[in-house]
Amino acid sequence: MKPLILLLSICSITYGQTYPTGQNYPPPTDLITVPTAATLMRGSFSLGMRIQDGGGMILGLRAGITDRFQFGLSYGSPNLIGDDSLRWYPRPEANLKYMLIDESITSPGVAIGLNTQGFGNFNQGDSLNRYDMKAYGFYLSASKNWKTSLGNLGLHSGVSSHFTETDDGDEDPNLFFGMDIELNPEFSVLMEYNAALNENNMTTETLAISRGGYLNAALRWTIVEHLHLELTFNH
């Protein structure tokens, strides 16, 4: 696990989204980087901006095509802010998600998706040919939400496999999980763990947060309806 904690901020604007009863922010389609089973509703869209360590920035736009299917694109630079020669990522990246099973009182919602957007530098032209933090690729995610005295509590988990960032020889399936909880109508806390099994020599048998992966946390502030600011701490 990287010892350096990176401070990131994410601004998300969601238009046309219908919120569940009693919930003052939309169920997150992602926690910080981890995908959940939630999708944008038909006709709604979200615009996100991620500021990365080293002056990088990623802009993303997602739209709800149906109540179950969302489509998005993202693009950016690992050093947009700063004095170094500007470098862009090699291509726009895709983000697709389809909700297979609706969440019920007794069972979680389940979604499948594709996310090809990684983070950090893109190591092009060397033996890696990948982002510093690999994209999730194809994934299956599950989410379950409960109403608490504070607000909504959501638990999320999933498995993923990437098909392009494999030049480093690590093609292991990956595991991820996380949670989000409302503290009040304005503030929410998000936590996640991406085991990054396709980036290290850890396996499911030796899985441990202390051995590797990315442990992230964020504080989400709903400034006004449909406008959310996140202060994120990433390993």
Positions of predicted regions on the chain:
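Mobile, glycine-rich extracellular loop/lid and propeptide segments
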Residues: M179
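Transmembrane beta-barrel domains of Gram-negative outer membranes and organellar outer membranes
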Residues: Q17-L153, S160-T164, E182-H235
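Glycine- and Gly-Pro-enriched alpha-helical subdomains that act as flexible
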Residues: D170-E171
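C-terminal intrinsically disordered extensions
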Residues: M1, G154, E165-D167
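Sec-dependent N-terminal signal peptides
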Residues: P3-T14
